[in-house]
Amino acid sequence: MRVLVLSQYFWPEVFRVNEIVSELSARGHQVTVLTGRPNYPDGELFAAFRDNPAAFSEYAGAEVLRVPLRPRGQGGLRLVLNYWSFVFWASLLGPWLLRGRQFDAIFVSASSPITSVLPAVLLKHIKRAPLLLWVLDLWPDTLSAIGVVRSKRLLDLVGLLVSFIYKHCDLILAQSRGFFPAIEQWSNAPEKTRYFPQWAEADFDVGVGPDLPSAAELVDHQHHFNIMFAGNIGEAQDFPAILDAANRLRDCSNIRWLIVGDGRVAPAVREAIERLDLRHCVFMLGRHPLSRMPEFFRGAGALLVSLKAEPIFSLTIPGKVQSYLAAGRPLLGMLDGEGARVIVEAGAGLVCAAGDGKGLADCVLSLARMGIDERDAMGRRAQAYGKEQFDRSRLLGQVEAWLQDAGRLV
């Protein structure tokens, strides 16, 4: 099968679409990737790519074709320019780079922005190939939830764009079943929607058992009960509520909060830690490669996932949930809806309502006071549930089957 994968983000940027490409290639399919130049998350072109672009033209047996784009940089205007520059160059150069090639199917990984799908719509008609779209963020809902767009007129325009894109897709894969109503509202074709959740990355196949040493960065925290947050530090993660919980437990000397990651609101979080005088219990450890996350998780008493109290966020399962489950550590959830349901259904930890700093503090105290055997049992249930519900091999086999079925219908 000849598959074109289109994604604004791709290796060496860390996204699960990388594993889709490597697995399809390993299963004998001819995969071509059309993507941009790597600049996420720092917003600057990767130095290694800048020095030797040719070294990034092949990945796991797949050919990688890259188009220019404006790096994300800092600030809203540069982000908008980044989004639209990919649309422009992928639409302009994509057909030229792919001239003379035919494909059995086109697969698009659509984390934000939804605009990145537009070149695929064009290529679908040029190549006469079916288009499969993996929806990881719901637009326009996400834009209003994080406060990026407040104008109803502009949100309605984005909604029309989303409807246009969905109607040109042959199959729409939703990362959460909670996405179905919104997708079907804009597509007006419920028969096209399928459930395709995220999974734990291959880096977590090693587990975090006793034979795995903790990260060296945790040596000063090894005798404490550590609440660890790992991932993007953004508006959606509601760090004011997390710091509210930390402030409520500021006098609990055995409890520490470790933040592993970076993001657009990281400077504001650092300032808040200083302002609230939480430097003795809240520590920002910076961003580290995904490959090192198991050794960081090894030193965690519990792994924290949070989302703001917005209706749209109650529909999503944050990608870190699957990684946390695979780590075999208790989970702490300060979120509503689908993400909370997974934790409760798995018996993998404790949850409180989104935005509830007091509730999170209470959950932390409950976990800290539990016996280690009880917490270990939570971790085992987490791993078992993750393997049952989010098995990587099964899910990648499913997307392969959908691509093959779509190709036969053309």
Walk through the language-model features, giving the residues of each:
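Membrane-proximal helix-turn-helix segments that form the acceptor-binding/catalytic region
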Residues: 115, 122-126, 152-172
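Conserved donor-binding/catalytic core segment of Leloir-type glycosyltransferases
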Residues: 200, 215-237, 243-246, 258
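A charged, aromatic-enriched C-terminal amphipathic alpha-helix characteristic of glycosyltransferases
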Residues: 355, 359, 372-403
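N-terminal subdomain of nucleotide-sugar transferases
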Residues: 1-60
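Nucleotide-activated donor-binding/catalytic signature segment of Leloir-type glycosyltransferases, i.e.
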Residues: 253, 258-260, 267-294
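Carbohydrate-associated surface elements
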Residues: 37, 178, 198-199
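Acidic donor-binding loop of glycosyltransferase active sites
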Residues: 170, 281, 297-314, 329
